[in-house]
Every structure is written in structure tokens, then in C-alpha cells.
């Protein structure tokens, strides 16, 4: 991560399975994406309330992380970019398997960013894609194609 960041690459870290990270790592992370349990391991805060989420993001940003996304399952996600917080509400779906929801969220987030999409569109894409993935059984086969994701309703 340090080498990639120093070469000007945009670095994204999903610390799964979560474990404590060396302090020097944080300043080389442009975006960290964590779920609730990973958030607790990295910050000591299991995010139940909105204040918990804000405090956890404060801790990660104070350590040098550029942006933070905390996924909350059916509750959606909260993302902090350049000091501004964005809350995404997950669409209501008939979830049958959450195996690949987080990976789908991260993949869609990075895909949207790499395509040059605006932040709102990127977050909507990640939110909708991850929700859609939960309506299918399995891991890789549950990840939707871009044409399957409708961000107009997010």
C-alpha cells in the first residue's frame, strides 16, 4: 500500500479479515471500506448510533485515511469524503444470501470511481449493486452486471 500510494495510485483497503493495522499504514490509504465488525477492530467502536459512526470516521480520518466508507448491511452505508458525510439508504430487497454484498459494494465503488463517475452516482451504484447481490445465492455468481443495476431509484 505504501509503495502504491507513493507512486500516485489511488489506494483502497478493505481489512477483511480484520485485524489491527500498523499506524503507518493509515496515511497511505485513500479509501478504507469497513463493515461494522471491522470498524470495531480498527477504532474500538461498534457503530450502532449515528454518533458512533461519526466518531469512528473521525478516528480513521485522524489517523490519516483520506476517505472512509462504513457498510451497514440492510441499513445502507455512510461515507466520508473530504470532510463531508454521505448516508446511503439500502433499497428494500428480498435478501436471501449476503455472502458477497460487501465485496460487491467495494467493487462497484471502485468501478464507479475508476470510470470517473461523480460521487453521488458511484455511491448509488455501490448501494444498488450490493443490495441486488443479496437477492442471489452464492458469491461471485451473485455479483450483478453493470446493465442490471438501476441507480435511478437509489
Where do the language-model regions lie?
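Conserved phosphate-binding/catalytic region of the ribokinase-like
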Residues: 3, 19-25, 50-154
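Conserved beta-alpha-beta core of the PfkB/ribokinase-like small-molecule kinase fold
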Residues: 1-55, 76-77
Amino acid at each position: 500500500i505504501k509503495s502504491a500510494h507513493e507512486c500516485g495510485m489511488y489506494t483502497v483497503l478493505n481489512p477483511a479479515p480484520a485485524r489491527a493495522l500498523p499506524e503507518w499504514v493509515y496515511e497511505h490509504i485513500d479509501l478504507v471500506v469497513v463493515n461494522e465488525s471491522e470498524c470495531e477492530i480498527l477504532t474500538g467502536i461498534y457503530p450502532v448510533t449515528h454518533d458512533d459512526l461519526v466518531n469512528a470516521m473521525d478516528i480513521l480520518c485522524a489517523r490519516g485515511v483520506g476517505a472512509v466508507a462504513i457498510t451497514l448491511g440492510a441499513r445502507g452505508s455512510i461515507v466520508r469524503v473530504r470532510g463531508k458525510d454521505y448516508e446511503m439508504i439500502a433499497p428494500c430487497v428480498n435478501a436471501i444470501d449476503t455472502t458477497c454484498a460487501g465485496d460487491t459494494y467495494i467493487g462497484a465503488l471502485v468501478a464507479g470511481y475508476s470510470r470517473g463517475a461523480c460521487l453521488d452516482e458511484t455511491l448509488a451504484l455501490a448501494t444498488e449493486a450490493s443490495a441486488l447481490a443479496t437477492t442471489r445465492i452464492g458469491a461471485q455468481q451473485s455479483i450483478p452486471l453493470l446493465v442490471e443495476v438501476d441507480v435511478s431509484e437509489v
